[in-house]
UniProtKB/Swiss-Prot annotation:
UniProt protein name: 4-hydroxy-3-methylbut-2-enyl diphosphate reductase
One MF annotation (Gene Ontology) recorded for this entry: 4 iron, 4 sulfur cluster binding
Protein EC: 1.17.7.4
Pfam families: LYTB (PF02401)
Lineage: Bacteria, Bacillati, Bacillota, Bacilli, Bacillales
EC class: oxidoreductase
Stated role: Catalyzes the conversion of 1-hydroxy-2-methyl-2-(E)-butenyl 4-diphosphate (HMBPP) into a mixture of isopentenyl diphosphate (IPP) and dimethylallyl diphosphate (DMAPP). Acts in the terminal step of the DOXP/MEP pathway for isoprenoid precursor biosynthesis.
C-alpha cells in the first residue's frame, strides 16, 4: 500500500532531552535510590515501560502534589510537562534529590505567568483540563490564572481586571487556540495575547494539515494520553478533511480501516518512539488486501530499542 510519511513527525527536542536526563539518572549510581518519575516522563506507555525495566518507578495520581506525597526518600524526576512551585517546595522540604526534565518551552510560560502576575496581570490560560502541563502552569499563580478549554468556558468567565494576558498550553491545536483566543479578545479587548504553542507542535500540525490532503486515511502513532497526538488526528479530520485514527502501536491497526484506501499518511506524536512508528510504516507498506499473509500486525520492537542511547557520566 502507498504510504505518505508525513514530515516532520515524532520526537521533539523537549521529549528527547527529558528521556536523556531520565536515562542518565537511571545509570548514575551516585543518585539516591529509589528513583521516581512524577507521572509519565512523556505521554507514551512504551517509554514508561522501558524506564521501568531500567529501575525507574513511574508514579501515577490525580496531580503532581498528591503523587509526591507518596515519596519519602530517593530521587524524583519532574516530567517534561513541568510542575508547580508547590511541588518543588515539597520536594525540597522532603530532602529529595531532584532531576528536572521540564521542557524549556513550558518553563517560558511559567516565567511569563510568574513575572506578569507580580505586575497585577490576570491570565486566561487555554489548555486541557486534567493535563499536567496546565496544572503546573496554573500552580505558578493560582489566584491569577483562569483555565479555559473551549469557547463556552470563555463565555462563563467573569474577570474584573484592566491587565489581562491570554496564553496557552504548548501542545494544543493551533486552530482551536486561535478560535478560543479570538473569543476571549472579543470579551476582553484590553487583553494581550501570548501564543505559547511550541514550534514542534506547530510544524507537525501544519504538516498534517497540508500533507493529509493527499491521503485517503491518516494514522497517528501516539499514546491516548498524548495531547499533541490526539490533536494531530483532529487536525487531519477537521482541517485536511481526511479520516484519521490514533494508535499506540502496530497491533492496534484494524484491517477494515484500509477498505477502499489507496494512500495512507502516517505521522507520530512528539513523544512517540521512532522504532514504533517505523514498524507501523513498514506494516502498511507491505499490506496487500489480496495477500492474507500481510494482514496480521505484530509488534517486534523491544523495550531495549525504545530509549535513546546516552553516555554514562563518570
Amino acid at each position: 500500500m502507498n504510504v505518505v510519511k508525513i514530515s516532520p513527525r515524532g520526537y521533539c527536542y523537549g521529549v528527547v532531552d527529558a528521556m536523556v536526563l531520565a536515562r542518565q539518572a537511571a545509570q548514575n549510581l551516585d543518585l539516591p535510590r529509589p528513583i521516581y518519575i512524577l507521572g509519565m516522563i512523556v505521554h507514551n506507555k512504551h517509554v514508561t515501560d522501558a524506564f521501568e525495566e531500567e529501575g525507574i518507578i513511574s508514579l501515577d495520581g490525580p496531580n503532581r502534589l498528591d503523587i509526591l506525597k507518596q515519596v519519602d526518600k530517593g530521587t524524583v524526576i519532574f516530567t517534561a510537562h513541568g510542575v508547580s512551585p508547590q511541588v518543588r517546595k515539597l520536594a525540597k522540604e522532603k530532602g529529595l534529590t531532584v532531576v528536572d526534565a521540564t521542557c524549556p518551552d513550558v518553563t517560558r510560560t511559567h516565567d511569563l505567568i510568574r513575572e506578569k502576575s507580580q505586575e497585577g496581570y490576570k491570565f486566561i490560560y487555554v489548555g486541557k483540563k486534567g493535563h499536567p502541563e496546565p496544572e503546573g502552569a496554573i500552580g505558578v499563580a493560582p489566584e491569577f490564572v483562569h483555565l479555559v478549554e473551549n469557547v463556552e468556558d470563555v463565555e462563563s468567565l467573569d474577570i474584573s481586571a484592566d491587565k489581562i494576558i491570554i496564553t496557552n498550553q504548548t501542545t494544543m491545536s493551533q486552530w482551536d487556540v486561535s478560535e478560543i483566543m479570538k473569543k476571549a479578545m472579543e470579551k476582553y479587548p484590553q487583553a494581550e495575547v501570548h501564543n505559547e504553542i511550541c514550534l514542534a507542535t506547530q510544524v507537525r500540525q501544519e504538516a498534517v494539515a497540508e500533507q493529509a490532503r493527499e491521503c485517503d486515511l491518516v494514522i497517528v502513532v501516539g499514546d491516548p494520553k498524548s495531547n499533541n497526538s490526539n490533536r494531530l488526528a483532529q487536525v487531519s479530520e477537521q482541517i485536511a478533511g481526511t479520516k484519521a485514527y490514533r494508535i499506540g502501536d502496530v497491533t492496534e491497526l484494524q484491517q477494515e480501516w484500509f477498505d477502499g484506501v489507496e494512500t495512507v499518511g502516517v505521522t507520530a506524536g512528539a513523544s512517540t518512539p521512532t522504532p514504533i512508528t517505523k514498524e507501523v510504516i513498514a506494516f502498511i507498506e507491505k499490506y496487500d488486501p489480496s495477500k492474507p499473509e500481510t494482514w496480521t500486525p505484530e509488534r517486534k520492537v523491544t523495550l531495549q530499542k525504545i530509549l535513546p542511547k546516552v553516555k554514562i557520566k563518570k
